[in-house]
Amino acid sequence: MANQKIRIRLKAYDYALIDRSAQEIVETAKRTGAVVKGPIPLPTKIERFNILRSPHVNKTSREQLEIRTHLRLMDIVDWTDKTTDALMKLDLPAGVDVEIKVQ
């Protein structure tokens, strides 16, 4: 489409899963003749939590946990209807959150 691009943002806790999904999207888009910019790795969001190990005493003994959220960004330019149909039929793993915007 003229002067429009598809922006795809992937979010997952497992970096291997998100990289595999991004590679699938890139291969599918290139197979249909679209131009793909990316995947661009965005900064990893790290959430850290401290919880008490003991339910009663020992306040100084704590467990430290963290959740890492990995992000990837891709832009698909010069796309056709064939590209959108192929992307809609693409089956991605359940652990990957996909956000698609047409700009």
From Swiss-Prot:
List, alphabetically, the SMART domains matched: Ribosomal_S10 (SM01403)
Keyword field: Ribonucleoprotein, Ribosomal protein
Q: Which PROSITE patterns match?
A: RIBOSOMAL_S10
In the UniProt record, which is one GO cellular component term? Answer: ribonucleoprotein complex
Q: Family per UniProt?
A: Belongs to the universal ribosomal protein uS10 family.
Subunit text: Part of the 30S ribosomal subunit.
**Which protein are we looking at?**
Small ribosomal subunit protein uS10
Tell me which species this is from.
Neisseria gonorrhoeae (strain ATCC 700825 / FA 1090)
Q: Show the taxonomic lineage.
A: Bacteria, Pseudomonadati, Pseudomonadota, Betaproteobacteria, Neisseriales
By which gene is this protein encoded?
rpsJ
